[in-house]
């Protein structure tokens, strides 16, 4: 089997690369090791509304559970800050359908798609990578390709086999645990985020409504914690008198929140999405970031193939670090500052920020917010709080 491009992994990043490159007229094979693309999910399923237009994805009700109008955050002592829009700001997806439809769009654009196909190694000839070794339904196969895209998730095999350093220590990951469950008492038009060092160490609890009385209720905590994410989530449910006897689905996963893969390209191999740890360090969301990275990668793959010059692939790394890197590094600095906050600090800051401030913070445009906070008496009276905020400027 021989293709211009083989894409390993059919989550979010992989199908977008496959679709874009196939649309340009090149032969593409998209493979995924799972028997059913999209399952199991490892995601809270929230996506900004802007992504559909920005990345040319149909707004299809088949994979949209609920439209969302904003967010509400809760401090350890119950103080809240709310951001609410008049228009839809995001959606809660059905990832099992969404991911499969992304693969469908790639197939309709001309890509070939093979589920239950696990890539186990690269093929090298005369020191160069010329393809991948895989197993399709247990049968060995070799796939030759000019370009290989590693979009196979946080535990990427193919990037490692290609010699790309994707290692990160355990403390740079969060451990996630989530129930899809029946739950009542939360405004279903908003996502809800609960912070606190006793609630979710180094993370938060989320309630992402999928219906009036059904939601993804999950947690992310530092993966090197002596207690499990499940322990903290069950504790939060019990403390809030939320029965856990109507659980429809359980999902677990690792969330890379401590930094990004530096070497995004090596020879003819590109790494995108969770495999490159291209995840927003503040909220741990990776779908929109994967879409951005895969769009940039697609552009340079197409140019490299059109001009028959694979050296152009390096421009993916350069462009991502130039356009997305600075924002992501700022968010990483913010995350590291937030990890130093006590519950008392969290109470203070949640009382001081507005909904507009929350929007700026989540997008990495937090300098003005930080400067305003530094002038407030509750911050000025604490040298430690001032030092934490100064480090962000």
Curated annotation (Swiss-Prot):
GO terms for cellular component: membrane. GO terms for molecular function: flavin adenine dinucleotide binding; geranylgeranyl reductase activity; oxidoreductase activity, acting on the CH-CH group of donors, NAD or NADP as acceptor. Gene3D superfamilies: D-Amino Acid Oxidase, subunit A, domain 2 (3.30.9.10), FAD/NAD(P)-binding domain (3.50.50.60). The keyword Lipid biosynthesis applies. Disulfide bonds: none annotated. Its cofactor is FAD. Binds 1 FAD per subunit. FAD binds at residues 13, 32, 43-44, 46, 95, 119, 274, 286. Pathway: Membrane lipid metabolism; glycerophospholipid metabolism. Pfam families: FAD_oxidored (PF12831), GGR_cat (PF22578). It catalyses: a 2,3-bis-O-phytanyl-sn-glycerol 1-phospholipid + 8 A = a 2,3-bis-O-(geranylgeranyl)-sn-glycerol 1-phospholipid + 8 AH2; 2,3-bis-O-(phytanyl)-sn-glycerol 1-phosphate + 8 A = 2,3-bis-O-(geranylgeranyl)-sn-glycerol 1-phosphate + 8 AH2; CDP-2,3-bis-O-(geranylgeranyl)-sn-glycerol + 8 AH2 = CDP-2,3-bis-O-(phytanyl)-sn-glycerol + 8 A; archaetidylserine + 8 AH2 = 2,3-bis-O-phytanyl-sn-glycero-3-phospho-L-serine + 8 A. A 2,3-bis-O-(geranylgeranyl)-sn-glycerol 1-phospholipid binds at residues 327, 363. GO terms for biological process: glycerophospholipid biosynthetic process; membrane lipid biosynthetic process. Its EC number is 1.3.-.-. It is an enzyme of class 1 (oxidoreductase). Coiled coil: none annotated. Keywords: FAD, Flavoprotein, Lipid biosynthesis, Lipid metabolism, Oxidoreductase, Phospholipid biosynthesis, Phospholipid metabolism. Reduction reaction proceeds via syn addition of hydrogen for double bonds. Belongs to the geranylgeranyl reductase family. DGGGPL reductase subfamily. Is involved in the reduction of 2,3-digeranylgeranylglycerophospholipids (unsaturated archaeols) into 2,3-diphytanylglycerophospholipids (saturated archaeols) in the biosynthesis of archaeal membrane lipids. Catalyzes the formation of archaetidic acid (2,3-di-O-phytanyl-sn-glyceryl phosphate) from 2,3-di-O-geranylgeranylglyceryl phosphate (DGGGP) via the hydrogenation of each double bond of the isoprenoid chains. This is Digeranylgeranylglycerophospholipid reductase.
């Amino acid at each position: 089997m021989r293709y211009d491009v083989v894409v390993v992994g059919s989550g979010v990043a992989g199908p977008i690369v496959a679709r874009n490159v196939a649309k340009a007229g090149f032969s593409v094979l998209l493979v995924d090791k799972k028997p059913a693309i999209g399952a199991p999910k490892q995601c809270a399923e929230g996506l900004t509304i802007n992504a559909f237009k920005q990345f040319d994805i149909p707004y299809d009700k088949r994979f949209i559970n609920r439209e969302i109008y904003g967010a509400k955050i809760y401090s350890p002592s119950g103080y809240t800050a709310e951001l609410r829009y008049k228009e839809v700001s995001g959606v809660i997806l059905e990832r099992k359908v969404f991911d499969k439809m992304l693969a469908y769009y790639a197939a309709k654009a001309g890509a070939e798609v093979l589920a239950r196909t696990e890539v186990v190694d690269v093929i090298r000839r005369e020191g160069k990578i010329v393809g991948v070794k895989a197993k399709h339904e247990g049968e060995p196969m070799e796939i030759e390709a000019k370009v290989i895209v590693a979009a196979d998730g946080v535990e990427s095999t193919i990037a490692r086999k290609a010699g790309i350093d994707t290692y990160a220590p355990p403390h740079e990951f969060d451990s996630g645990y989530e129930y899809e469950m029946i739950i009542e008492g939360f405004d279903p038009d908003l996502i809800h985020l609960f912070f606190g060092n006793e609630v979710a160490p180094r993370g938060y609890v989320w309630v992402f409504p999928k219906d009036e009385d059904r939601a993804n209720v999950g947690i992310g905590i530092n993966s090197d914690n002596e207690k499990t994410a499940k322990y903290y989530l069950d504790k939060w449910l019990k403390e809030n008198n939320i029965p856990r006897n109507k659980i429809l689905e359980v999902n677990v996963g690792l969330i890379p929140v401590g930094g990004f893969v530096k070497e995004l390209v090596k020879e003819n191999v590109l790494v995108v999405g969770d495999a490159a740890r291209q995840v927003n360090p503040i909220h741990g969301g990776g779908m929109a970031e994967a879409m951005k990275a895969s769009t940039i990668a697609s552009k340079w793959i197409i140019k490299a193939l059109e001009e028959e010059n694979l050296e152009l692939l390096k421009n993916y790394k350069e462009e991502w670090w130039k356009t997305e890197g600075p924002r992501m590094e700022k968010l990483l600095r913010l995350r590291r500052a937030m990890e130093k906050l006590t519950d008392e600090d969290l109470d203070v800051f949640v009382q001081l920020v507005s909904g507009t401030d929350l929007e700026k913070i989540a997008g990495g445009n937090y300098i003005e917010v930080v400067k305003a906070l530094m002038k407030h008496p509750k911050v000025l009276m604490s040298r430690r709080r001032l030092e934490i905020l100064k480090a962000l400027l």
